[in-house]
Amino acid sequence: MTEGVLINENEVESKLEAVIKPGSFTGENAGEMAEVILIPKKAIDIKLEADVITPDSFAGKSAEEIGKLSVWQGPKTYPLSEFFEVTGNGGSSAAETLIRIKGDAMRIKRIGESMSAGKIEIEGSAGMHVGTGMKGGELVVYGDADSWAGMEMTGGLLHIKGNAGDHVGCAYRGKWHGMKGGRIVIEGSARHQLGGGMDGGEILVEGDVKSFCGIRQNGGLIFVKGSALRGVGAEMAGGTIVIGGKIERFSPGFEFVSMENSITSGEVELIGEFKKFTGDYAISKRAKGALYVVADTNPEL
């Protein structure tokens, strides 16, 4: 699912078209960017905590200074250069800094945490908490992303070209409010509790999701082009969920409202034949969540 294009599923049961506008999630374009390249030196056994890998941290620093930034491995800190060959200097600002990780980063956590501008490209998979707390900029993962991707992000674009784990765009453990802004695009599938506690922003999934997509959702849009297992919108109080495929087990707290032929939410416009439900009334009779399902793929609802 790419931005600014039309998705047409007329060759399958579900007839659904989606126009996704690029939006302004990444902030102003800084033009030509200074590029910092990180090349892994060795296989990583114990996972790294590398929240310093952001355009904000690299901006204004030379390659040597970037290499001296500290990362955690277990109870110890090491310089970034212990694990990466660093080439290139940061730009004069975060918006003018591009970080390119040339290799797999599945055992590196917290890449892009709280970044406000600029761009990160990971030429492989990414570890847990990638893009957590993003405020702006663009982060592209060319492989898969582990769990907690985009947790509590407020802005920016997180683009995962592979699959994603559990708790994408969700709230931190013990908190009730997850993602508040920005956009997450997943070209593959995602696992459990996508958008848990989501307050705003957009999550767009090309493939399928597992259980409890949109659990405790309060706002924002979740659009899943594929199917969902069960518990969609459980404890939902607000926001919008659209499922293009089949929901295997429908949540009992939702009531049918009407048939709709288009849905518009922010920069996303969906065209098709939808059944609209509201809920989750199993939790509160004042709930205002909207759940849309494509009629052709859910004839029994």
Curated annotation (Swiss-Prot):
InterPro entries: Formylmethanofuran_DH_suC (IPR017550), Glu_synth_asu_C (IPR002489), Glu_synth_asu_C_sf (IPR036485)
Keywords, in A-Z order: Methanogenesis, Oxidoreductase, Repeat
Pfam families: GXGXG
Name of the protein in its database record: Molybdenum-containing formylmethanofuran dehydrogenase 1 subunit C
Modulation of this protein's activity: Inactivated by cyanide.
Region (7 X 13 AA repeats of [GW]-X-X-[MQ]-X-X-G-X-[IL]-X-[IV]-X-G): 112-245
Source species: Methanosarcina barkeri (strain Fusaro / DSM 804)
SUPFAM superfamilies: Alpha subunit of glutamate synthase, C-terminal domain (SSF69336)
Gene Ontology terms, MF aspect: formylmethanofuran dehydrogenase activity; transition metal ion binding
